[in-house]
Amino acid sequence: MPLDSLTLMIVYTVNVTAVAFGLSVALLGQGSRAALCAQAGALAQAIGWICLVASGFFRDTWGDQLLSTLAMLLMSLSLALLLQAVRKWRGSPCLPRALYLAALGMPLLYALGFHHYPWRVGLANGVIGAQMLWLAAEAIRPGAPGSWRWRSLIGGSMAALALVTFWRGVLGAFFTELYPTFATPHPVNLIGSLLNNAATVLTGIGVLAAFREEAEAQLKTLAITDGLTQVLNRRAWSERAELQLSDAKRYGHPMIMLMIDLDHFKQINDRRGHATGDQALQLTA
């Protein structure tokens, strides 16, 4: 049975919208910044593809240019947001705000050169492919926290999509007669459409797995630390002390224990209130 590029793109748009809705419901109300970035990225990707498919119904009109440019903006932004989420889950610093502004540069140049087809196709696919490659590299980068399971799902999906995206950009920029429209039934386009559907599902699973890992780490931290001072609680401290003492005895290392006591702490609570007493504990900790 022959595959139709436009039909595959419409199916993908439905799939990515469903995944965006599913992630929004699954992660609804979660305070994690990484989870919020992942939700926003999925939503931006879904709206971007809706705009791209809709632009095909306004061929050679101002609506085509407007919807296509908006699609490029949202797709670029979605990858930046997913990259931010992955970096947060891996314990890396946040992306500089300047990089978000840089994501606006491609859609602007895309709009200015919209009527030059090779330029806009090469530019858009080149920039988006580079973002995918960066995201894949960040996900599979060794040495940082994060289970290899969810990292391999996201990293592998993005690497495969980056390869096809670069290929599509080369065709549009240098072999335009082989790829005159985004719905052209070229093998690269068909492969890209199929990969999009698979990668969206795998990336969604990877995001949920990463969030679960983050939630488990938070629960573990809550179980072994004091909620006010964030220092080890009595149970965790006793377990840690036994291990340290055993190591000191085994290897003959000296060991020092320091105990800090706050004088007149009850008077602080009685005279200035428990809120001030809590602040004193936090300052000492």
What label would you give each PLM region?
Residues 1-17:
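Hydrophobic transmembrane alpha-helical segments in integral membrane proteins
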Residues 18-37, 47-183, 190, 200, ...:
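Juxtamembrane segments at transmembrane-helix boundaries
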Residues 220-239, 260-274, 282:
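Conserved nucleotide-binding and Mg2+-coordinating catalytic segments in signaling enzymes
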Residues 243-256, 260, 271:
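Nucleotide second-messenger and two-component phosphorelay signaling modules
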Residues 279-285:
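GGDEF/GGEEF active-site signature
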